[in-house]
Amino acid sequence: YDLGGGTFDVTIAEVKNKKVDVITSRGDKYLGGKDFDLEIAKLFNKKYKLQHNTEIDLNNKYYIQKAEEVKKILSVKDKTRMNIQGPKGEMEIEISREEFEEAIQTYIEKTKMLIEEVMEASGMNPKRINQVLLVGGSTRVPAVIKSLTKLMGKPPVKGVNVDEAVVCGAAIYAGLKTENKSLNEKQKEALSQVELTDVCNFYMGT
């Protein structure tokens, strides 16, 4: 379950010893944490307008950056306050986790639909999935974890660095596809034992 800043992917893979067989994969290249940030910025706008009767510019990166800060805080706290500068001066705005989760529910539902598509395409069901791995910074959002746990009937596995997993995977994949002369003999031997079969993640068109 890979939910990053701008994309979402879900993959079912079978791992035996050091062989990784990708069975099915689905994704949405326009769904990610940036959508969560925008929804928080919309909450800023709603509350600012209520008090000042004027709107803030949601295209301004300042509000998106402030929204991202709020998102990170709400991953560990139930609510937070943020000072927001608007057309009619600064305003302290309070955002609760409950408000945030309600605002992003549509996006979480989209990820659930893609999981169900992957399950159907592979002929699998949640009971046959041994482990659920999270990748991508947006998987820190409690509502995401809660939704996934409920759907799969088990909590995701902890211990994987959600920020570094993609980079590590890409490095291994590149090593499998090319001859990397910077590797020492021990690293080359370890890499030679890894076998990966992959599928195309997205429809490529005709």
Kindly label every feature range from the protein language model:
Residues 1-206:
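Oxyanion-binding/catalytic loops of NTP- or PPi-dependent enzymes
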